[in-house]
Amino acid sequence: MKIKYFGTAAYEGIPALFCQCESCRRALALGGKNLRTRAQALIDDEVLVDFNADTVAHYQKYKFDWTKIKYCLITHSHSDHFYPRDLSMFVGRYYTHNVSHIDFYGGKSVYDKIEEIIHDESLCPDPTRLTATEVKPGDLLTLNGYKVVAADADHDPE
C-alpha cells in the first residue's frame, strides 16, 4: 500500500493566515516541509482521503492523476476536510473535461450536501460523474479490495 500525504495540518494550516506567532513566522521563513496544508492523503493513487479547499493546490503541487481516483472518503464535514464548493468544478460543464466517475463516502451531512449538488441542475449538469454513499460509525466498506471501517469523528469542543 502506497500512502501519499498531501497535507497534515488542521483548518488553519501552518503558517496560519494572518498569524504572526513565533511558530508561524519560523515555518514561513524556513519554507519547504515546514509549510503545512490541510489534511489530505491518497492511497495507491485511487482512494482520496478528504476533499478540502487545498485540493487544487495539492493537485498542482503533486500532479496526481484524477482519472485513477475511484473513491473519496470524507472523514467528517468540517471545511478543512470537506469543501463541497469545489465539487461544482468536478460536475460542472465548463471546468473539467474527460473526468472519471468518483464514489464519495461520508457521514450524513456530507452525503446530504453531495446529494444537494447532484440534484441541482444549475450546479451539476452531469450527475453521472459522482455518487454519494452515507456511512455510519461501524460500517464496513469494501472498495476494490480495500476494507474500510467508518469511525466516529468528534473533535469539536462544542
What positions do the PLM features span?
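Binuclear metal-dependent hydrolase catalytic cores
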Residues: M1-E158
